C-alpha cells in the first residue's frame, strides 16, 4: 500500500467513524425536522416555517435555536411573524416606502421571547428558542414562524413541478447538529400553527432533516458517573480527567470550595464556564448508590450534582440503561418514562424533574431521587457489578463510567451467596479423593 492509498484509507475510516457516531441506539430515529409550508405563491410568497424536535430525550435549551440558510437568488424577507432576523442587512437596493425585514443573503432567524404581543405571534412561537424533547413535553417540542418573501426566482423540482428555488446550507445554530439540503415533499397542513384569524391551506412543502452527533458538539464529555453501595465502604469516583484535567491549558476555569466566581459586568455579556475544581473536571456528576436490599425489592438513590458555578440546567433529563428498570415499582421526586420497549425488553428509561419543584437544577446545586425495584429472580444479583447502570446520559450527552473492575465488590471480594454455595460444593468434591486417601 503506497502513501496515497494509506492517506485515503485513514480518511475513509475517520469519515466512517464520524457518521457512525451520529447513530444513537437509544433513539435511532431521533432528529429535528424543519418544514416550509407555502400558503400562497404569487409575486411574493407566504410560508409557515416550523421546527419539530423528534428526539426522545434531547432538547434545545437556552440560548435556543438559530435557524439559518442561504438563499438561491436575491430573495428578500418583507415581513415576519413569530420570529425575527438577527440582522437586517444591506437593503439600499430596495426602493419604496416599505422597508424589508431582512435583505441578508444568509439570514439568521431567532425565536421571539415569551410575552411577545399577540399581533406578532403564531401558534407554537415565542419561547426563546427552547424546544422540549418528545418525552418531556410534546406540546412544546415544536416552534413556528411565518414570513413573506419576495425577489425569488422559480426553479423546476425533481417531480417536474415549478416553484421558488430551494435555499441551501441550512443550520439550526445548535452545536452538534448538521442539516440536509431542502427537498420538496408531499404538502402538509400548517393550519395548527396559525392563529384563528389567519387560517390558510398549504400549497407546497419543503423539508430539511437535522441530525445530532456528540462527536461534532464537543471534543470531550460533559458528565461522569460515580458509584457506591451499602455492601462496600468504597466509593468509586468518576474516572480522573473524565472531561478534562484540572491543570490542563484547555480546561475551563475552576474554583475551590468556598470561592465565588467572577460575574460579568453587563447583563448581555457572555459568561464563560466556571466549574468547581475536581479530579474529573465535569460540569455534571451522576452518583448511583445501591442503598438497601429487601427480601423481594432493592433500593437505589441517584444524585445529580451541578459543578457549574454560573449555569442552571432547566428542563434537565437523565437517561439510564439497566436491565431491572422493567421492574421499577416506585419512584420519588422525579418523573419517569420507559424509552425502549421491544417485547419483554425494557431496559432504558428517562428521568426528569417535576414542574415547579425540581425541573431546574441550580448552579452548584443538585437534585436527587430514590427508586424501588422488584428483584427479578431470573437474573438479579449483586455480583459482577450487575446492580450498576450500563449507560448514563445527562441532557443528551453520554457520561463517562468507571471501569468495571473498579465497581464496589461484595464482602471479601466474593460474589453473591448463590455462587459462593456452588464454589463450596465444587471445592468439597475436589477434596473428597484426598479425604479417602487419608482414611
Swiss-Prot record:
Keywords: Cell membrane, Glycoprotein, GPI-anchor, Lipoprotein, Membrane, Signal. The keyword Calcium does not apply. Residues 413-439 form a propeptide. Glycans are attached at residues 138, 181, 186, 232, 312, 346. It is found in: Cell membrane. Belongs to the COBRA family. This is COBRA-like protein 7.
Amino acid at each position: 500500500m503506497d502513501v496515497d492509498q494509506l492517506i485515503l484509507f485513514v480518511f475513509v475510516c475517520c469519515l466512517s467513524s464520524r457518521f457512525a457516531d451520529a447513530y444513537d441506539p437509544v433513539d435511532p430515529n431521533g432528529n429535528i425536522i424543519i418544514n416550509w409550508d407555502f400558503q400562497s405563491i404569487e409575486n411574493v410568497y407566504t410560508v409557515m416555517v416550523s421546527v419539530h424536535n423528534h428526539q426522545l430525550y434531547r432538547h434545545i435549551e437556552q440560548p435556543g435555536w438559530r435557524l439559518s440558510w442561504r438563499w438561491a437568488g436575491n430573495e428578500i424577507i418583507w415581513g415576519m411573524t413569530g420570529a425575527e432576523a438577527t440582522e437586517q442587512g444591506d437593503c439600499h437596493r430596495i426602493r419604496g416606502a416599505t422597508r424589508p425585514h431582512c435583505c441578508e443573503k444568509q439570514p439568521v432567524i431567532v425565536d421571539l421571547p415569551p410575552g411577545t404581543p399577540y399581533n406578532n405571534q403564531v401558534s407554537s412561537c415565542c419561547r426563546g428558542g427552547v424546544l422540549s424533547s418528545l418525552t418531556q413535553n410534546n406540546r412544546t417540542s415544536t416552534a413556528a414562524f411565518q414570513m413573506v418573501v419576495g425577489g425569488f426566482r422559480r426553479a423546476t423540482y425533481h417531480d417536474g413541478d415549478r416553484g421558488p428555488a430551494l435555499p441551501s446550507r441550512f443550520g439550526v445554530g445548535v452545536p452538534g447538529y448538521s442539516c440536509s439540503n431542502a427537498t420538496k415533499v408531499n404538502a402538509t397542513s400548517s393550519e395548527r400553527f396559525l392563529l384563528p384569524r389567519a387560517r390558510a391551506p398549504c400549497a407546497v412543502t419543503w423539508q430539511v432533516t437535522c441530525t445530532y452527533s456528540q462527536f461534532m458538539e464537543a471534543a470531550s464529555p460533559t458528565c461522569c458517573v460515580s458509584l457506591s453501595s451499602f455492601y462496600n465502604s468504597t466509593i468509586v469516583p468518576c474516572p480522573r480527567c473524565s472531561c478534562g484535567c484540572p491543570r490542563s491549558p484547555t480546561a475551563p476555569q475552576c474554583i475551590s470550595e468556598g470561592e465565588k466566581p467572577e460575574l460579568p459586568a453587563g447583563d448581555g455579556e457572555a459568561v464563560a464556564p466556571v466549574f468547581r475544581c475536581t479530579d474529573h473536571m465535569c460540569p455534571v456528576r451522576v452518583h448511583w448508590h445501591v442503598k438497601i436490599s429487601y427480601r423481594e425489592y432493592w433500593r437505589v438513590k441517584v444524585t445529580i450534582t451541578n459543578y457549574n458555578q454560573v449555569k442552571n440546567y432547566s428542563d434537565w433529563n437523565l437517561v439510564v440503561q439497566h436491565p431491572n428498570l422493567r421492574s421499577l415499582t416506585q419512584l420519588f421526586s422525579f418523573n419517569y418514562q420507559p424509552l425502549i420497549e421491544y417485547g419483554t425488553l425494557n431496559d432504558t428509561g428517562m428521568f426528569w424533574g417535576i414542574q415547579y419543584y425540581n425541573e431546574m437544577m441550580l448552579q452548584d446545586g443538585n437534585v436527587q431521587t430514590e427508586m424501588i425495584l422488584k428483584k427479578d429472580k431470573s437474573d438479579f444479583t449483586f455480583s459482577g457489578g450487575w446492580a450498576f447502570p450500563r449507560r448514563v446520559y445527562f441532557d443528551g450527552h453520554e457520561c463517562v463510567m468507571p471501569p468495571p473492575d473498579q465497581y464496589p465488590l461484595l464482602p471479601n471480594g466474593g460474589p453473591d451467596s448463590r455462587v459462593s454455595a456452588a464454589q463450596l460444593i465444587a471445592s468439597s468434591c475436589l477434596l473428597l479423593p484426598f479425604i479417602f486417601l487419608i482414611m
